[in-house]
Amino acid sequence: FVASAGFSPLAGDGRVAVLADRSGRLRPAIWDPASGQRTDLELELPGEVDVADWWPDAQALLLVHTYMGRDELSRLDLRSGALERLEHPAGSIQRAGVRPDGAVWYRLSSGAAAPEVRAVGAEEAVLRPPGPRAPAGVAYESWSFTNSEGDQVHGFLAVPPGAGPHPTVLLVHGGPHHHDADAWDPEVQAFVDHGYAVGLVNYRGSTGYGKAWQDVLEGDPGRPEIEDVVAGRDDLIARGLADPTEVVITGASWGGYVTLQAIGTVPEGWRAAMAVVPVADYLSAYADESEALQAFDRSLFGGGPEDRHDLYVERSPITHVDRVATPVLLMVGDNDTRCPLQQVLNYAERLRELGKPFELDRFDAGHGALVVNERIRQMEVLLRFAARHVPGGAEPEA
């Protein structure tokens, strides 16, 4: 992987900051297209490093170091190689930049606090969204456990007040090349407000933990993720945090795929499952999805269905639907080109034929909704479905 991270701001200076992962982790370099010279920037940092901006004099870079789901800002002097950590609250940095006067502004959020624009060295935010501020959320706790292959898997927990065990939601991120960070997520806080502990698992295939971790899924999708999510569930039960009779699995997009694949291949131990815009029937999804997604699937599976037919069938949730032993909510957009409607309807029809309890919620949009009222409605649907099947979960207010 190689990508541009921004040209030098000085007129006549053709240098470009670039990013590459050939070391196994994302690292910056400086490239001069005129001379062809490339200088890798040696950094003693354990995580992934991105370039947010140049200083106006082009003598330093503003770096974002991502490690274990949290971000740190640093100033790298390109002349001396000195790395200066910039002080700021813990959390995730969505954007950062250096202003003409040298001030560093950044957009920060955490599990406990909604996004705001802050300046390094300032006590208060410099910009906030208009209107009332979001109420403070429950802070995330860093969480690690061992999977079935002996790997350390990292994630986060958001836990309601009071002693456990709690009804628990495993909220599986999409992507699959994405990761859950210590960042503001109203969905997590909504579940916590209704009495659930929430586990966020950065399964094998997630970004943020190095190239080897991210590439595990190549040629083997739909197995490592499920193993890691199940190991996370079992760890929370062993800790006494999760009630073993009240565990819900949910996720959107690839998280919805993991949800359906988990309840079909590891059917025991789930009280309910909620799959939002999921892949449910892989052969049908491949036929109907956009060309860009077909290319992604070919890279993930090692070929198309004509090349790896048996693998597509084995890693398709509809293949295992007869083993499903928990109520299922399917939520799907009528105009979704990433996880198309028909393949979810195929899965729903198989559930109906088998007499399995399920609900189907269709909405007039694509791969998710951007309209605020629709997103609120969807969250209410999820909470009401969970409450109907999990005795310890609270119903949302009317």
Regions found by a protein language model. Name each.
Residues 64, 70-71, 83-161, 183-189, ...:
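Non-catalytic accessory segments flanking enzyme active sites
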Residues 20, 65, 108, 121, ...:
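Residues that line or immediately flank small-molecule/substrate-binding pockets and catalytic motifs
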Residues 203-398:
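Active-site-proximal cap/loop segments of hydrolase catalytic domains
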Residues 1-3, 25-26, 48-49, 70-71, ...:
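Flexible loop/turn segments at secondary-structure boundaries
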Residues 132-245, 252-253, 287-295:
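Cap/lid segment of the alpha/beta-hydrolase catalytic domain
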